[in-house]
Design a protein with these regions (language model features):
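Short, Lys/Arg-enriched N-terminal segments with co-localized hydrophobic residues
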Residues: 1-6
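Short glycine-aspartate micro-motif
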Residues: 8-12, 67, 131-135
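Short glycine-rich, Thr/Ser-proximal phosphate-binding strand/loop in the N-terminal lobe
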Residues: 8-51, 148-166, 170-171
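Glycine-rich phosphate-binding loops at beta-strand->alpha-helix junctions
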Residues: 38, 69-76
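Phosphate/pyrophosphate-binding loops at sites that engage ATP/ADP/AMP, CoA/4′-phosphopantetheine
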Residues: 49-65
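Short glycine-rich phosphate-binding loop at a beta-alpha junction
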Residues: 61-71, 90-92
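Phosphate-binding/catalytic loop of phosphoryl-transfer enzymes
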Residues: 81, 86-92, 98-171
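A mobile "lid/hinge" subdomain adjacent to the ATP/sugar-phosphate binding pocket shared
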Residues: 170-182
Length: 182
């Protein structure tokens, strides 16, 4: 068993992977990745999550809450329902109306992706303001937060693999290379 009964399950639903983490206070108990799969059912995701708890010897009763950040809306309710069945309480879903301490200075703050919000909040927590956060996933995102904790802008760019695939497929002489270190 782990420390106490204050663990939070954090789930980041991305386009390519779902990252699942368990946090006990300031201690990260585990971080694992599963493939994002729109064909999976609620039950299949619940089985994956429960398997992780067994693997890391964490009791269901030790989890006091869960939070979801998602850029894949079709999976939101599937995973949310699964977590409700597992923990008998609704997870927090990062989105409009969730208080983060971040002032989003955009014409329509509700359009800012939850991935960008959680990256900015994590950056502020660990490094303070001002900060520029770069997240290199399926898309590369850049978030800028000023010294007053205002989210003042960002960019969404093709990720490294998406860019590489595009260049290889749309150019005549560029060979496919590995993104892995030699």
């Amino acid at each position: 068993k782990r420390q106490g009964k204050s663990m939070i399950l954090a789930i980041d639903i991305g386009n390519t992977n779902i990252v699942i983490g368990c946090i006990d206070g300031e201690k990260v108990c585990f971080v694992e990745r599963a493939s994002t799969n729109l064909a999976k059912t609620e039950l299949e995701y619940v089985v994956e999550f429960r398997t992780l708890f067994e693997l890391y010897h964490i009791g269901m009763e030790d989890i006091t809450g869960s939070i979801i950040s998602s850029v894949v809306p079709p999976l939101n309710n599937i995973i949310k329902s699964g977590l409700e069945k597992m923990f008998h309480q609704a997870p927090m879903v990062v989105g409009p109306g969730v208080k983060t301490g971040l002032n989003i200075l955009m014409d329509n703050p509700a359009q800012l992706g939850s991935d960008l919000v959680v990256n900015a909040v994590a950056g502020l927590h660990y490094y303070g303001a001002p900060i520029i956060m770069i997240d290199m996933g399926t898309a590369t995102t850049i978030s800028v937060v000023d010294e007053k904790k205002n989210y003042i802008g960002g960019m969404i760019l093709p990720g490294a693999k998406v860019s590489l695939d595009s260049l290889v497929n749309r150019t005549s002489q560029l060979p496919r290379i590995s993104l892995e270190p030699p």
